UniProtKB/Swiss-Prot annotation:
Protein name (Swiss-Prot/TrEMBL): Beta-1,4-galactosyltransferase 5
Pathway(s) this gene product operates in, as recorded in its UniProt entry: Protein modification; protein glycosylation; Sphingolipid metabolism
All ranges on the Cytoplasmic side of the membrane: 1-14
Chain's gene name: B4galt5
Lineage, top ranks: Eukaryota, Metazoa, Chordata, Craniata, Vertebrata
Record key words, sorted: Disulfide bond, Glycoprotein, Glycosyltransferase, Golgi apparatus, Lipid biosynthesis, Lipid metabolism, Manganese, Membrane, Metal-binding, Signal-anchor, Sphingolipid metabolism, Transferase, Transmembrane, Transmembrane helix
């Protein structure tokens, strides 16, 4: 009788345990879906730490190998006569470092191109992450008559090397935009770039489509001016160095390489998020961003694939120049896009079908003193993809 009761209790306990673990896993999956930003921050931190550990192991291995080689050559040289030349592992043919930024007394000429390494670019920026009203930002920059409607500015003392359109995807981040403008506008002025800000705001009930907003912003910006450089900039990323030059180059550029919330480590080699830059020619060649990524995640990885498929490589700033601070979020982020991995597996096949060439939209355009606001209601029907 007791044995029978024990047998009855065992399945019941197993069932309760199974229900408990099912409930726990369901709750975890739901949290990952509705709050992907928090979850992925921790995942990226762990991934970055793993990469750092791997690199440290490689460095230690190289140092051990060097010491072994040094010891071997030391023994060899001690047994040779004085006519032999010992190997000097400290010898280097590299030239001594030069000062790359111009001196304070540099003279500008109105008909000469602006240099890329100006004396006004000091390096570290004094970051102020406290919230500020947009009216206060307007008041702050209203003293500069050179800033035109829509945040358009160009230097008067030299010819700007790049005409830069700053594209900012936007939804419900009204407390972030003034903080970004407070830091970014003076930095771009110190870099002597011609620039304007485009805030592309998504309304409606569909999940956030960051990539499609960038495509819309590109199309609208090119109606204003023959821009030659595009900066795709998240609204919550604040650069920490004004030597992170927001011009473009022969290869696409990833600016935000070290983000504070990822412990200033690159989460993975193909990471292309936060702030990136391409020339207009490069952006058209890769067919822009994909339009099919609804919700959080995947579009930057697809952009990386597009860049590689087009024969480009990605350049990054050296050292700590690519450091950024992330403005804390006071609300829940966008939901996770669960279909991104299936799309990423077909990146190459989709590249010629999904992007600038299948984009349709209707925009409501208004002007702020410091940016052009482009409001769109995006739906999947506006960027349908044929079978591939």
């Amino acid at each position: 009788m007791r044995a029978r009761r024990g047998l009855l209790r065992l399945p019941r306990r197993s069932l309760l345990a199974a229900l408990f673990f099912f409930s726990l896993s369901s709750s975890l999956l739901y949290f990952v879906y509705v709050a992907p930003g928090i979850v992925n921050t921790y995942l990226f931190m762990v991934q970055a730490q793993g990469i750092l550990l791997r690199d440290n192991v490689r460095t230690i291995g190289a140092q051990v190998y060097e010491q072994v080689v040094r010891s071997a050559y030391a023994k060899r040289n001690s047994s040779l006569n004085d006519s032999d030349y010992p190997l000097d592992l400290n010898h280097s043919e590299a030239f001594p470092p030069t000062t790359t930024f111009l001196p304070e007394d540099f003279t500008y000429f109105a008909n000469h191109p602006c240099p890329e390494r100006l004396p006004s670019m000091k390096g570290p920026i004094d970051i102020n992450m406290s919230e500020i009203a947009m009216d206060d930002i307007h008041e702050l920059f209203s003293r500069d008559p050179a800033i035109k409607l829509g945040g358009h500015w160009k230097p008067a003392d030299c010819v700007p090397r790049w005409k830069v359109a700053i594209l900012i995807p936007f939804r419900n981040r009204h407390e972030h935009l003034p903080v970004l403008l407070r830091h970014l506008l003076p930095m771009l002025q110190r870099q002597r770039l011609q620039f304007a800000f485009y805030v592309i705001e998504q309304v409606g009930t569909q999940p956030f489509n960051r990539a499609m907003l960038f495509n819309v912003g590109f199309q609208e910006a090119m109606k204003d001016l023959d821009w030659d450089c595009l900066i795709f900039h998240d609204v919550d990323h604040i650069p920490e160095s004004d030597r992170n030059y927001y011009g473009c180059g022969q290869m696409p550029r990833h600016f935000a390489t070290k983000l504070d919330k990822y412990m200033y480590l690159l989460p993975y080699t193909e990471f292309f998020g936060g702030v990136s830059g391409l020339t207009v020619e490069q952006f058209r060649k890769i067919n822009g961003f994909p339009n099919a990524f609804w919700g959080w995640g995947g579009e930057d990885d697809d952009l990386w694939n597009r860049v590689q498929n087009a024969g480009y490589s990605v350049s990054r700033p050296e050292g700590d120049t690519g450091k950024y601070k992330s403005i804390p979020h006071h609300h829940r982020g966008e939901v996770q896009f669960l279909g991104r991995y299936a799309l990423l597996r077909k990146s190459k096949e989709r590249q010629g079908l999904d992007g600038l060439n299948n984009l349709n939209y209707s925009a409501n355009v208004t002007y702020d003193a410091l940016y052009k606001n482009i409001t769109v209601n995006l739906t999947p029907e506006l960027a349908q993809v044929t079978e591939y």
